[in-house]
């Protein structure tokens, strides 16, 4: 029997191919649960999940909440806007307060890289990173991988082109780590101003042309232009950005005929992707949302139930 030896899910970094496969297989089981009429189980009955979102996120928070509830957990969404954090309380103070309530898992999203890892050091329960600054977003990478694997039957040796604002994207970082671990070929396509220094050292091919970067790609993953994280002139204008790096039907022709079109959401239609593509037959964007609930169910069950069936370490995946 394969055991999952980790207490927290802080990032994809530190996960083995076996760990990732285990979670994806678990998520496949969760998809079946989510598609049946009676969706609620008693797997996590009596356990408490607290969602602590310091950054606004409708879809991710709703996905985590639904995942916990479908497993039978008691789920509490902490509204940071009305909390002591707004009154000057530090993350550590918040962690100590929540830990005293004895939850079983804390789900955190924070604008600062490393926030989830810091929280994990201060609490006695499991911690799941729902996105920390520009660092990582592990469950997004897992749901993307599940979407690809279910459509293509594998992850190894497929060509994935990640296009757009790579510099500010924690989604890109987590996907690169996961896809490389699973044997995929990863490309990044972006203007030089939207690529982090040393990106090639992460084991990706770098392109500055959409036509060249998408050639023979099995998957085209578009990233949102994150204007709220920008403090400088990274692109001349939105119009020019779309002209060179937006995905429309004509640009998509460079990829394979059966290439998948993906986007982590929320989309900027007419900025990084055209509606004709986002809503077209090659789009699996809706499937990504569905797989998100399944992946988060798998993560919760694994951290809180499955890991107790075998040996584990208290070390973080960070």
Curated annotation (Swiss-Prot):
> Which GO terms of the molecular function aspect are on file?
amino acid binding; aspartate carbamoyltransferase activity
Give the EC number(s) under which this enzyme is classified: 2.1.3.2
Gene Ontology biological-process entries:
'de novo' pyrimidine nucleobase biosynthetic process; 'de novo' UMP biosynthetic process; amino acid metabolic process
Coiled coil stretches, renumbered: none
Pathway involvement of the protein, from the record: Pyrimidine metabolism; UMP biosynthesis via de novo pathway; (S)-dihydroorotate from bicarbonate: step 2/3
Q: Does the keyword Amino-acid biosynthesis apply?
A: no
The reactions it catalyses are: carbamoyl phosphate + L-aspartate = N-carbamoyl-L-aspartate + phosphate + H(+)
Q: Which residues bind carbamoyl phosphate?
A: 59-60, 109, 137, 140, 265-266
The alphabetical list of record keywords is: Pyrimidine biosynthesis, Transferase
Q: What class of enzyme is it?
A: transferase
Protein name stated in the entry: Aspartate carbamoyltransferase catalytic subunit
Q: Which organism is it from?
A: Rhizobium etli (strain ATCC 51251 / DSM 11541 / JCM 21823 / NBRC 15573 / CFN 42)
Query: What gene is this protein translated from?
Result: pyrB
